[in-house]
Swiss-Prot record:
It catalyses: uridine(38/39/40) in tRNA = pseudouridine(38/39/40) in tRNA. Disulfide bonds: none annotated. PANTHER family: PSEUDOURIDYLATE SYNTHASE (PTHR11142), TRNA PSEUDOURIDINE SYNTHASE-LIKE 1 (PTHR11142:SF0). This is tRNA pseudouridine synthase A 1. The keyword Isomerase applies.
Length: 247
């Protein structure tokens, strides 16, 4: 058996998230459907670095699967991309040992969130950025960002629906990139809780709008209560950008 690692990019707009759900179109469902065709009807389960929600995009999602087929890496890439819909692309394939695991071997993840700061919607970017129609004080946002960096209990910044009991995570970097009419938030951490990036972005936008003081972030973290953080930003501005492994 070969263990195959794939890096996957997808446009999340027309998916109900990554993970299989009955009666809904998902990324995992489409990948496993393509693999089933390649394996003459045999079901092949894939493991991913993590789930993404409905409408969330990925540039660098990572999956693995085990297979009895002996194909070269480029053959896997060509075969899968031929069978996958045009909103999913396999961008890289590597053969790995059994020690590699797409989920449990993750060392760090990078997410990016795009905000279009404009009163006027952009019809061509509407599925890929969060249009924010209010003026923002970028310096206030920059002042708030360092409070999130480091190891914290992020209970205040995750969905109440999370199934994770341990809410402690480490954020290594948060970078705010000003690019034309967009603000791009770049997050690197050892892992992220359910909706965590989107809630942090929503909170930082509140800071930029003057609804929250930048220095209030430590207090919100300490309260460990979701109701004190900002509104969650929508899914379509979020991208799983890159996943790094310890092996």
């Amino acid at each position: 058996m070969d263990r195959i690692k794939c890096t996957v990019a997808y446009d999340g707009m027309h998916f109900c998230g990554y993970q299989i759900q009955p009666q809904h179109r998902t990324v995992q469902q489409e990948i496993e459907k393509a693999l089933q065709k390649l394996h003459k009807g045999e079901l092949v389960r894939v493991q991913a670095s993590g789930r993404t929600d409905s409408t969330v995009h990925a540039k660098g999602q990572v999956i693995h699967f085990d297979t009895p087929l002996s194909l070269e890496e480029w053959q896997w890439s060509n075969a899968l991309n031929t069978m996958l819909p045009d909103d999913i692309v396999i961008t890289q394939v590597e053969k790995k040992t059994e020690e590699f695991h797409a989920r449990y071997g993750v060392e760090r993840k990078e997410y990016r969130y795009r905000v279009l700061v404009s009163k006027t919607a952009d019809v061509f970017r509407r599925n890929y950025v969060y249009q924010y129609p209010y003026p923002l004080e970028v310096n206030s946002i920059r002042k708030a960002i360092p409070y999130f960096i480091g190891t914290h209990d992020f209970t205040s910044f995750c969905s109440a629906k999370t199934d994770k009991k341990d809410k402690v995570r480490t954020i290594y970097e948060i970078e705010l990139i000003e690019q034309d009419d967009e603000l791009i938030f770049r997050f690197v951490g050892n892992g992220f809780l359910y909706n965590m990036v989107r809630i942090i972005v929503g909170t930082l936008l509140n800071v930029g709008q003057g609804k929250l003081d930048p220095d209030s972030i430590p207090e919100i973290l300490a309260k460990q209560n979701r109701q004190f953080a900002g509104k969650m930003a929508p899914g379509h501005g979020l991208y799983l950008w890159q996943v790094n492994y310890n092996n």
